[in-house]
Amino acid sequence: MELCVALDLPSAKENLALAESLKAYNVWMKVGFRAYIRDGKPFIEALKAINPDFRIFLDLKLYDIPNTMADAAEEIAKLGVDMFNIHASAGAVAMKTVMERLSSYEKRPLVLAVTALTSFNEENFRMIYEKGIDEKAEQFARMSFENGLDGVVCSTFESRAIKNATSDDFLTLCPGIRPFGEDAGDQQRVATLELANEERVDFPVVGRPIYKDSDPKGKVEEILKLISTF
């Protein structure tokens, strides 16, 4: 299990200050929509300057026609990030096209597919997909696995079933982690680190419980200490 810290603060200055405070730890850093749209490639470079061993997850959730997604995936690969994601809803052709485009890279980033956003509850998910979260997430995961992706973004509650349906090596990255049972905020399907471990999560994503803590570095130390016991 490897910790992924969500850099979701309102400004580059705040996000970089958080990263600076964590530079002693070779954790993953999640860069999302707001940070990347606002701060772009220089922000990625600034993170790597703080700690070259930070691994960067670019959380842009690509969702478009296959060739457009593949074009974007190639540009992402050129940024030197370590992982990015696409929407599984884009379908098998899009997945295959993206992976074929990246096959020429000697060291390509990991590619994950988003199954069901953790902000969904069962009722709202069914209104869109006409199936339950568990069933559809597993279907999306099998499609992703069959088309050569490295893993999926899902909630902790789908992780074990997804690995059983695909492979133990098929990665699960799970937002909505409240390490010690902190407030859920706008997330619907949240879990503690202990549960994430039981459900074989590879990458727990933690944001607010870290950056809203009075001592973010201390919180990360607590989290890493707990992970080391698993």
From Swiss-Prot:
The active site is at 61 (proton donor). It comes from the Bacteria. PROSITE patterns: OMPDECASE. GO terms for molecular function: orotidine-5'-phosphate decarboxylase activity. SUPFAM superfamilies: Ribulose-phoshate binding barrel (SSF51366). Homodimer. This is Orotidine 5'-phosphate decarboxylase. It comes from Sulfurovum sp. (strain NBC37-1). The lineage of its organism: Bacteria, Pseudomonadati, Campylobacterota, Epsilonproteobacteria, Campylobacterales.
